[in-house]
Amino acid sequence: MKITPIAFESLGVRSQATLIETKDLRVLVDPAISLAPRRYNLPPHQREVDRLTELAKVLVDVAKDVDVIIVSHYHYDHHDPGYVIPTDIYKNKLVFIKDPQNMINNSQKYRRAPRFLRSIKDKPSKIEIADGKTFEVGHTTISFSPAVPHGADERLGYVIQVAISDKDSTVIFTSDIEGAPKDVHLKFTKEKMPKTIIIDGPLSYLLGRVLKEEELEKSIRNMEEIVKNGLETVIIDHHVLRDINYAEVLKPVYDIAKDLGVRVTTAAEYLNLEPLILEARRKELFKEDNRPAKIPRGLANLLSAGEG
């Protein structure tokens, strides 16, 4: 099995787009890319826009040759109705989606999911609602958790976690569980016993606003439990990489992983690259170059459509 992170916060954008290849299947998970509309009360910097444009091209190119596309939920850094990533990537693909009607918040149920499904209408070879189901595709097994909360607050909606297995190994993509602040977030991982997990990490950059101290502490404890679950590799990237101090936040997890011989890494480091932290450094970027960014129309429309 080969795992290739395509776009993540450690690669300079908001995304969890990941390519997973088994012996007989190429699966693309959450093919979307976004930026924070505002951070430190600043709009995106030109370096962020350029990086998004660069990775969007890579993502579209990768999508041409995949067999399966998975959409774990309907936030704009996980799905795209055509703002930045053209919906033609779904042509002739088998598409697994989060249930657009059940265990879903109102903004996704009545606006985002319907718009997305209209945008890809008649393009996939087949669309399957995936929540809680298991599918055999060739010699590859793709399993989905029941819908679980998007972090500690169900008002943000629900996501489905994904386990992809061949005869050799299993990888879990947790989607936006925000570092597993609830015990229900752990159930799927404990059932599937993966060798590799891709997890987003807590919203520590919003501590004291959206995230409570006790929720952060529970996330870290539960991530420690995940590391103890027989894993070989843990890719922690997405929400927590929006915090410039992410390494300090995750130190307890790193420490336990080191003791157990588990590799804990960002998506960039998994690719043997230095993390390219842009959003968390936006103030610094504007101090270096204060010119307004030239934002393409599609990205401008995406940013105006709302965060998340």
Curated annotation (Swiss-Prot):
It comes from the Archaea. Pfam families: Lactamase_B_2. InterPro entries: Metallo-B-lactamas (IPR001279), RibonucZ/Hydroxyglut_hydro (IPR036866), UPF0173_UPF0282_UlaG_hydrolase (IPR050114), UPF0282_hydrls (IPR014426). HAMAP family: UPF0282. PANTHER family: UPF0173 METAL-DEPENDENT HYDROLASE MJ1163-RELATED, UPF0282 PROTEIN MJ1629. Belongs to the UPF0282 family. This is UPF0282 protein M164_2122. It comes from Saccharolobus islandicus (strain M.16.4 / Kamchatka #3) (Sulfolobus islandicus).
